[in-house]
Swiss-Prot record:
Name of the protein this chain belongs to: DNA-directed RNA polymerase subunit gamma
Record's function text: DNA-dependent RNA polymerase catalyzes the transcription of DNA into RNA using the four ribonucleoside triphosphates as substrates.
Organism, scientific name: Trichormus variabilis (strain ATCC 29413 / PCC 7937)
Keyword set, alphabetical order: DNA-directed RNA polymerase, Magnesium, Metal-binding, Nucleotidyltransferase, Transcription, Transferase, Zinc
SMART domains in the record: RPOLA_N
Known cofactor(s): Mg(2+); Zn(2+)
Database matches in PANTHER family: DNA-DIRECTED RNA POLYMERASE, DNA-DIRECTED RNA POLYMERASE SUBUNIT BETA
Entry's EC annotation: 2.7.7.6
A Pfam family it matches: RNA_pol_Rpb1_2
Catalysed conversion reaction: RNA(n) + a ribonucleoside 5'-triphosphate = RNA(n+1) + diphosphate
Cofactor note: Binds 1 Mg(2+) ion per subunit. Binds 1 Zn(2+) ion per subunit.
Gene expressing this chain: rpoC1
Amino acid sequence: MRPAQTNQFDYVKIGLASPERIRQWGERTLPNGQVVGEVTKPETINYRTLKPEMDGLFCERIFGPAKDWECHCGKYKRVRHRGIVCERCGVEVTESRVRRHRMGYIKLAAPVAHVWYLKGIPSYISILLDMPLRDVEQIVYFNSYVVLSPGNAETLTYKQLLSEDQWLEIEDQIYSEDSQLQGVEVGIGAEALLRLLADINLEQEAESLREEIGSAKGQKRAKLIKRLRVIDNFIATGSKPEWMVMTVIPVIPPDLRPMVQLDGGRFATSDLNDLYRRVINRNNRLARLQEILAPEIIVRNEKRMLQEAVDALIDNGRRGRTVVGANNRPLKSLSDIIEGKQGRFRQNLLGKRVDYSGRSVIVVGPKLKIHQCGLPREMAIELFQPFVINRLIRSGMVNNIKAAKKLISRNDPSVWDVLEEVIEGHPVMLNRAPTLHRLGIQAFEPILVEGRAIQLHPLVCPAFNADFDGDQMAVHVPLSLESQAEARLLMLASNNILSPATGRPIITPSQDMVLGAYYLTAENPGATKGAGKYFASLDDVIMAFQQEQIDLHAYIYVRFDGEVESDQPDTDPLEVTNNDDGSRTVLYKYRRVREDAQGNLISQYVRTTPGRVIYNKAIQEALAS
């Protein structure tokens, strides 16, 4: 049993993290007082023992044990040692799933700028510093120096960019014997950026910007407002500008960037491990160069390479050359994992796969009722499997779940009969993405069909904005009796005839249906085959048409003693004939009537076409059913 989740939360807030906060995420103090959490080695696992290397990217001391209830050295095994920290290897005896959420960190030997805030659009670092992005990049990537403090030098201004030669010239002046220059400070790289950002007093800056905006106009005013908005956001969230330059970077849990052994003994690893390894290697090399007091040019080059390695880790390809793997494939950075359709948010958090659902291509089902849909058999047996198993056990056909599953997997004929019983009266919900209004999900009664495509009634297509050119739809099964009742009463397609947006009918015939109705009821005086024939009933007309004795549009007379409505009143007789038996035959424009001497109707023949008879019969049958 897993412990119940007690720490409920309302929302997730994304913001800048301070170096102290990043250390807090990964740092833990062991019972012996040792502080762990910093990843210092680029190694992942020992290829001989296949165990994680200590202080490496998969370190068990930092991230937790690789096996449940077992320390690294093997001194403690089994759940009875729960919570003990091994005094030999320093690994806590706990579940291995802690490796999915325990983090580490890398302490950088030199600060690096966060590429999102440097190269994003807009670039927040350049907005805050009120410098062009090109100049900020020149500083970060060690191409230009920047004046941090002009001192008493008249030729220098705060934030002025200097080339290598200009700085060497000024340096010579500073260190010459008769120099008058004092307090001149010049920096390069992210360290200089850190200093510039730390020097910004947000409240004062916001105050002066508000005063400036009052008198500014046009482009300058828009620029000032943009800068003020960024500064106000920093003040509101309690973030500091210098946090956009990182001195500590977090290492995500190892089980989120796994390393798995393949059949041939080789290992497949997440791209993040390669990117982290590059950062650690360059960071360690830089620390060593600083220790041995290496020449400035070498240290600067190493700092630039560290900046590029961290850029690639956070957002590969955002700036400079894209880091590629073994087969010239760009490595997936943290940004690539988060963003886009296949990213963590859209793929895993917003759109999850759910049980009792399926999806398939839709095809037209012209023989379906409006509240029905055709559900493929193999899909239905999977969706309704628990109900089928329950029915099989209750009916005594099998004794347990295992036997029922075996029966289903064998496609036993009795299973299909049970499935028919189960789905009777059990609505399913069909959804077509994108669900733009409530009619994007509707309930239908499933009808089992052969094949692998879902059959949909053509009249409900406008509500789903569906067509049959390869569209796919998802099926969901409501499980509880309450949800089934709700689906039947509120969501059934036959209950959703009017659009909730406009109040107009959304179920309207279109395309083939309109064309078919028009063709059946159209008049064509040129159709002469069988024209003028008399028929005793509507069925006789259809039979004659099927035997090809009459054309679909030929004018015929069919006996129909009921009331006849027409567009124009048909009351003026064209011809009246008196018969020998006292009755009379009256010929109107659209009918022929025989009456007795008192004017009572004996028989009536209506002029129509076989097409109209077929149309009439189809509507009558639909209404009757």
